[in-house]
Amino acid sequence: MSKLSRATRALRKPEAEGVIRTILRAGQAMPGPPLGPILGQRGVSINQFCKEFNEKTKDIKEGIPLPTKIFVKPDRTFEIKIGQPTVSYFLKAAAGIEKGARNTGKEVAGLVTLKHVYEIARVKAQDDAFALQDVPLSSVVRSIIGSARSLGIRVVKDLSSEELAAFQKERALFLAAQKEADLAAQAEAAKK
């Protein structure tokens, strides 16, 4: 490599523009990893981004995961586009669970009714992914049912409070047994 080509390579500025897609929790943007290094590579002021994001999401319940697009311009300014919460967040909230099933298809982590799915579909149908493609509501509902299945959430037609209470009691016992088995496996692994 000649001296001239090395000098030109050194003078070239790194590409500063582009789109960063991420999921950030409302009101909890911080300059640390993983967001800080990504924005820093593009020359964006991390503190300014965090202030602006937290200001835009101050009316939303803190901690809700929001799909976010960050458009970085050539002059290293940025524009933030915040989407609605993810389908998995809505499904887990409707089912009253924190995590999905470990073994989807074999265990059921929660129950939701078709009414819940329909309400989630009405909200998500306004999302860019569905609205730009003019997707019918029935397709959005099928997509959400597929997401529920992948989380281990069973979609039922009707659900009485007694059935829900019985399921939650059974699920709590299952999770306690699973936790005990995990602790026993960890203790066994520590002995080896």
Curated annotation (Swiss-Prot):
GO function terms (MF aspect): large ribosomal subunit rRNA binding; structural constituent of ribosome
Subcellular location: Mitochondrion
InterPro entries per record: Ribosomal_uL11, Ribosomal_uL11_bac-typ, Ribosomal_uL11_C, Ribosomal_uL11_C_sf, Ribosomal_uL11_N, Ribosomal_uL11_N_sf
CDD domains cross-referenced by the UniProt entry: Ribosomal_L11
Gene Ontology CC, one term: mitochondrial inner membrane
Gene Ontology terms: biological process: translation
Keyword Kinase: no
Sorted UniProt keywords: Mitochondrion, Ribonucleoprotein, Ribosomal protein, Transit peptide
Alphabetical list of Pfam families matching this protein: Ribosomal_L11 (PF00298), Ribosomal_L11_N (PF03946)
Domain of life, per lineage: Eukaryota
Keyword Transit peptide listed: yes
Subunit structure: Component of the mitochondrial ribosome large subunit (39S) which comprises a 16S rRNA and about 50 distinct proteins.
NCBIfam families: L11_bact
Similarity comment: Belongs to the universal ribosomal protein uL11 family.
Protein name from the UniProt record: Large ribosomal subunit protein uL11m
